[in-house]
Amino acid sequence: MKLPWLAADTPFPPVEQALRDPDGLLAAGADLSPERLAQAYAHGIFPWYAEGEPILWWSPDPRMVLACADFAPSHSLRKRLRALARTEHDPAARLQVRVDTAFARVLHECAAPRHGQPGTWISPAVQQAYRSWHAAGFVHSIETWIDGELAGGLYGVSLGRMFYGESMFARATDASKIALAHLVAFLRRHQVAWIDCQQQTGHLARLGARPVPRARFIEHIAHAVAQPRLPWRSGRLDSAGMLHPLPPANGVMM
Protein backbone atom coordinates (compact mmCIF):
# COMPACT_ATOMS: atom_id res chain seq x y z
CA MET A 1 0.00 0.00 0.00
CA LYS A 2 1.33 3.44 -0.93
CA LEU A 3 1.75 5.77 2.03
CA PRO A 4 -0.45 8.89 1.65
CA TRP A 5 1.47 12.16 1.29
CA LEU A 6 -0.19 15.13 2.99
CA ALA A 7 -0.04 18.63 1.55
CA ALA A 8 -0.69 21.61 3.80
CA ASP A 9 -4.45 21.42 3.22
CA THR A 10 -4.83 17.63 2.97
CA PRO A 11 -6.88 16.04 5.77
CA PHE A 12 -5.64 12.92 7.51
CA PRO A 13 -6.88 9.62 6.11
CA PRO A 14 -8.99 7.42 8.41
CA VAL A 15 -6.83 5.77 11.07
CA GLU A 16 -8.15 2.38 9.96
CA GLN A 17 -5.94 2.80 6.88
CA ALA A 18 -2.75 2.78 8.96
CA LEU A 19 -0.20 0.12 8.07
CA ARG A 20 0.22 -3.03 10.10
CA ASP A 21 3.97 -3.10 9.40
CA PRO A 22 5.27 -0.82 10.67
CA ASP A 23 2.33 -0.79 13.07
CA GLY A 24 0.30 2.39 12.87
CA LEU A 25 2.15 4.33 10.16
CA LEU A 26 -0.62 6.38 8.57
CA ALA A 27 0.79 9.18 6.42
CA ALA A 28 3.74 11.46 5.72
CA GLY A 29 4.16 15.15 5.04
CA ALA A 30 2.18 18.23 6.11
CA ASP A 31 3.60 20.38 8.92
CA LEU A 32 3.75 20.75 12.70
CA SER A 33 1.60 23.86 13.02
CA PRO A 34 -0.60 24.07 16.13
CA GLU A 35 -3.66 23.64 13.94
CA ARG A 36 -2.32 20.47 12.29
CA LEU A 37 -1.17 19.03 15.63
CA ALA A 38 -4.56 19.71 17.22
CA GLN A 39 -6.30 17.97 14.33
CA ALA A 40 -3.95 15.00 14.64
CA TYR A 41 -4.23 14.47 18.39
CA ALA A 42 -8.00 14.89 18.37
CA HIS A 43 -8.15 11.95 15.94
CA GLY A 44 -5.66 9.71 17.74
CA ILE A 45 -2.69 10.53 15.49
CA PHE A 46 0.77 11.72 16.53
CA PRO A 47 4.03 12.65 14.74
CA TRP A 48 7.15 10.53 15.21
CA TYR A 49 10.13 10.62 12.89
CA ALA A 50 13.90 10.92 12.89
CA GLU A 51 15.67 14.15 12.03
CA GLY A 52 16.16 14.34 8.28
CA GLU A 53 13.07 12.26 7.53
CA PRO A 54 9.74 13.68 6.35
CA ILE A 55 7.14 14.10 9.07
CA LEU A 56 5.59 10.69 9.74
CA TRP A 57 2.15 10.33 11.34
CA TRP A 58 1.15 7.32 13.42
CA SER A 59 -1.91 5.70 14.97
CA PRO A 60 -0.89 2.26 16.30
CA ASP A 61 -3.26 -0.56 17.15
CA PRO A 62 -3.40 -1.36 20.01
CA ARG A 63 -2.72 1.92 21.82
CA MET A 64 -0.89 2.06 25.15
CA VAL A 65 -3.02 3.88 27.74
CA LEU A 66 -2.58 4.60 31.44
CA ALA A 67 -5.98 4.74 33.11
CA CYS A 68 -5.53 7.20 35.97
CA ALA A 69 -7.48 4.86 38.27
CA ASP A 70 -5.01 2.06 37.47
CA PHE A 71 -1.80 4.00 38.18
CA ALA A 72 0.35 1.55 40.14
CA PRO A 73 3.46 3.05 41.75
CA SER A 74 5.88 0.60 43.31
CA HIS A 75 5.95 0.08 47.08
CA SER A 76 9.10 2.19 47.42
CA LEU A 77 7.62 5.00 45.33
CA ARG A 78 4.38 4.98 47.33
CA LYS A 79 6.43 5.25 50.51
CA ARG A 80 8.35 8.20 49.12
CA LEU A 81 5.18 9.91 47.92
CA ARG A 82 3.65 9.62 51.40
CA ALA A 83 6.75 11.20 52.93
CA LEU A 84 6.65 14.03 50.39
CA ALA A 85 2.97 14.69 51.11
CA ARG A 86 3.79 15.35 54.77
CA THR A 87 6.17 18.19 53.90
CA GLU A 88 4.83 19.54 50.61
CA HIS A 89 3.27 22.68 52.12
CA ASP A 90 6.48 23.61 53.94
CA PRO A 91 8.11 26.53 52.05
CA ALA A 92 11.49 25.06 52.98
CA ALA A 93 10.71 21.58 51.61
CA ARG A 94 13.60 20.22 49.56
CA LEU A 95 11.32 18.77 46.89
CA GLN A 96 8.52 20.46 44.97
CA VAL A 97 6.47 19.49 41.95
CA ARG A 98 5.63 22.39 39.67
CA VAL A 99 3.68 22.97 36.48
CA ASP A 100 4.85 25.06 33.52
CA THR A 101 7.69 26.88 35.28
CA ALA A 102 10.46 25.48 33.04
CA PHE A 103 8.77 24.07 29.95
CA ALA A 104 11.63 24.77 27.54
CA ARG A 105 14.13 23.11 29.89
CA VAL A 106 11.97 20.01 30.29
CA LEU A 107 11.61 19.76 26.53
CA HIS A 108 15.38 20.14 26.10
CA GLU A 109 16.11 17.45 28.70
CA CYS A 110 13.62 15.05 27.12
CA ALA A 111 15.30 15.63 23.76
CA ALA A 112 18.74 14.57 25.02
CA PRO A 113 19.86 11.21 23.54
CA ARG A 114 19.36 8.26 25.90
CA HIS A 115 21.96 5.66 26.75
CA GLY A 116 22.27 3.19 23.89
CA GLN A 117 20.32 5.39 21.46
CA PRO A 118 22.06 7.18 18.59
CA GLY A 119 19.71 10.16 18.53
CA THR A 120 16.32 11.54 19.44
CA TRP A 121 13.02 12.12 17.65
CA ILE A 122 12.58 15.42 19.54
CA SER A 123 14.49 17.41 16.93
CA PRO A 124 14.92 21.20 16.99
CA ALA A 125 11.93 21.47 14.61
CA VAL A 126 9.78 19.35 16.94
CA GLN A 127 10.90 21.39 19.94
CA GLN A 128 9.95 24.63 18.20
CA ALA A 129 6.55 23.23 17.25
CA TYR A 130 5.72 22.15 20.79
CA ARG A 131 7.01 25.40 22.27
CA SER A 132 4.55 27.20 20.01
CA TRP A 133 1.76 24.87 21.09
CA HIS A 134 2.75 25.38 24.72
CA ALA A 135 2.50 29.15 24.23
CA ALA A 136 -1.04 28.58 22.95
CA GLY A 137 -1.89 26.71 26.17
CA PHE A 138 -2.14 23.11 24.93
CA VAL A 139 1.19 21.57 26.01
CA HIS A 140 2.36 21.46 29.62
CA SER A 141 5.32 20.41 31.72
CA ILE A 142 5.19 18.76 35.13
CA GLU A 143 8.50 19.25 36.90
CA THR A 144 10.20 17.75 39.95
CA TRP A 145 12.52 20.21 41.69
CA ILE A 146 15.02 19.19 44.37
CA ASP A 147 16.93 21.86 46.30
CA GLY A 148 15.96 24.42 43.70
CA GLU A 149 17.24 22.36 40.76
CA LEU A 150 15.19 20.72 38.02
CA ALA A 151 15.63 16.99 38.70
CA GLY A 152 13.10 15.39 36.38
CA GLY A 153 9.71 15.71 34.77
CA LEU A 154 7.56 15.16 31.75
CA TYR A 155 5.56 17.05 29.17
CA GLY A 156 2.38 16.31 27.29
CA VAL A 157 -0.59 17.59 25.35
CA SER A 158 -3.91 18.50 26.97
CA LEU A 159 -7.07 18.63 24.85
CA GLY A 160 -10.39 18.83 26.63
CA ARG A 161 -10.43 16.04 29.22
CA MET A 162 -7.65 14.05 27.54
CA PHE A 163 -3.92 14.09 28.28
CA TYR A 164 -1.33 12.75 25.85
CA GLY A 165 2.03 11.96 27.44
CA GLU A 166 4.98 12.79 25.22
CA SER A 167 8.27 12.18 27.03
CA MET A 168 9.89 11.98 30.48
CA PHE A 169 13.36 12.48 31.90
CA ALA A 170 15.03 12.04 35.28
CA ARG A 171 18.29 13.33 36.71
CA ALA A 172 17.51 11.92 40.16
CA THR A 173 15.95 8.65 41.31
CA ASP A 174 12.17 8.56 40.84
CA ALA A 175 12.05 12.23 39.74
CA SER A 176 9.99 11.57 36.61
CA LYS A 177 7.74 9.08 38.42
CA ILE A 178 7.04 11.63 41.17
CA ALA A 179 6.00 14.12 38.50
CA LEU A 180 3.76 11.48 36.90
CA ALA A 181 2.12 10.63 40.24
CA HIS A 182 1.25 14.29 40.80
CA LEU A 183 -0.03 14.62 37.23
CA VAL A 184 -2.30 11.61 37.78
CA ALA A 185 -3.69 13.25 40.93
CA PHE A 186 -4.37 16.49 39.02
CA LEU A 187 -6.06 14.64 36.16
CA ARG A 188 -8.22 12.54 38.47
CA ARG A 189 -9.32 15.70 40.29
CA HIS A 190 -10.55 17.03 36.95
CA GLN A 191 -12.23 13.83 35.72
CA VAL A 192 -9.59 12.85 33.17
CA ALA A 193 -9.74 9.08 32.82
CA TRP A 194 -6.84 8.25 30.50
CA ILE A 195 -3.30 9.28 29.69
CA ASP A 196 -2.25 8.32 26.18
CA CYS A 197 1.17 6.66 26.28
CA GLN A 198 1.25 6.10 22.49
CA GLN A 199 3.45 3.00 22.34
CA GLN A 200 3.98 -0.07 24.48
CA THR A 201 6.95 -0.14 26.86
CA GLY A 202 7.76 -2.29 29.87
CA HIS A 203 8.43 0.80 31.98
CA LEU A 204 4.91 2.13 31.47
CA ALA A 205 3.36 -1.31 31.91
CA ARG A 206 4.96 -1.57 35.36
CA LEU A 207 3.20 1.68 36.29
CA GLY A 208 -0.19 0.33 35.24
CA ALA A 209 -0.43 1.20 31.54
CA ARG A 210 -2.20 -1.30 29.30
CA PRO A 211 -2.83 -1.66 25.55
CA VAL A 212 -6.36 -0.97 24.34
CA PRO A 213 -7.80 -1.53 20.86
CA ARG A 214 -7.44 1.52 18.65
CA ALA A 215 -11.18 1.63 17.98
CA ARG A 216 -11.87 1.91 21.70
CA PHE A 217 -9.20 4.59 22.07
CA ILE A 218 -10.67 6.65 19.21
CA GLU A 219 -14.15 6.32 20.67
CA HIS A 220 -12.89 7.53 24.06
CA ILE A 221 -11.00 10.57 22.80
CA ALA A 222 -13.87 11.67 20.55
CA HIS A 223 -15.85 12.33 23.72
CA ALA A 224 -12.95 13.47 25.93
CA VAL A 225 -11.52 16.17 23.66
CA ALA A 226 -14.97 17.75 23.29
CA GLN A 227 -15.08 18.49 27.03
CA PRO A 228 -14.03 21.84 28.57
CA ARG A 229 -10.30 22.51 28.89
CA LEU A 230 -8.52 21.87 32.17
CA PRO A 231 -7.61 24.81 34.47
CA TRP A 232 -3.87 24.74 33.80
CA ARG A 233 -1.67 27.47 35.21
CA SER A 234 1.92 27.85 36.31
CA GLY A 235 2.45 26.94 39.95
CA ARG A 236 3.15 24.26 42.55
CA LEU A 237 1.26 20.99 42.30
CA ASP A 238 0.47 19.09 45.50
CA SER A 239 -0.13 15.38 46.01
CA ALA A 240 -3.91 15.88 45.98
CA GLY A 241 -3.73 17.37 42.48
CA MET A 242 -4.28 20.98 43.53
CA LEU A 243 -2.35 23.82 41.91
CA HIS A 244 -1.00 26.61 44.12
CA PRO A 245 0.66 29.88 43.09
CA LEU A 246 4.39 30.09 43.65
CA PRO A 247 5.55 32.84 46.00
CA PRO A 248 7.58 35.64 44.42
CA ALA A 249 11.35 35.35 44.61
CA ASN A 250 11.47 37.68 47.62
CA GLY A 251 9.06 35.41 49.49
CA VAL A 252 6.32 38.04 49.82
CA MET A 253 2.93 37.06 48.41
CA MET A 254 1.25 39.79 46.38
Swiss-Prot record:
InterPro entries: Acyl_CoA_acyltransferase, Leu/Phe-tRNA_Trfase, Leu/Phe-tRNA_Trfase_C, Leu/Phe-tRNA_Trfase_N
UniProt subcellular location: Cytoplasm
Parts of the chain that traverse the membrane: none
Pfam families: Leu_Phe_trans
Main subcellular location: cytoplasm
Enzyme Commission identifier(s): 2.3.2.6
Annotated keywords: Acyltransferase, Cytoplasm, Transferase
Domain of life: Bacteria
One annotated GO molecular function: leucyl-tRNA--protein transferase activity
Alphabetized Gene3D superfamilies for the sequence: Leucyl/phenylalanyl-tRNA-protein transferase, C-terminal domain (3.40.630.70), Leucyl/phenylalanyl-tRNA-protein transferase, N-terminal domain (3.30.70.3550)
Signal peptide: none
Cellular component per GO, a single term: cytoplasm
Main enzyme class: transferase
Catalytic function, reaction form: N-terminal L-lysyl-[protein] + L-leucyl-tRNA(Leu) = N-terminal L-leucyl-L-lysyl-[protein] + tRNA(Leu) + H(+); N-terminal L-arginyl-[protein] + L-leucyl-tRNA(Leu) = N-terminal L-leucyl-L-arginyl-[protein] + tRNA(Leu) + H(+); L-phenylalanyl-tRNA(Phe) + an N-terminal L-alpha-aminoacyl-[protein] = an N-terminal L-phenylalanyl-L-alpha-aminoacyl-[protein] + tRNA(Phe)
Gene Ontology terms describing biological process: protein catabolic process
Entry function: Functions in the N-end rule pathway of protein degradation where it conjugates Leu, Phe and, less efficiently, Met from aminoacyl-tRNAs to the N-termini of proteins containing an N-terminal arginine or lysine.
Stored PANTHER family: LEUCYL/PHENYLALANYL-TRNA--PROTEIN TRANSFERASE, LEUCYL_PHENYLALANYL-TRNA--PROTEIN TRANSFERASE
Family to which the UniProt record says this protein belongs: Belongs to the L/F-transferase family.
Official protein name in the record: Leucyl/phenylalanyl-tRNA--protein transferase
Record gene name: aat
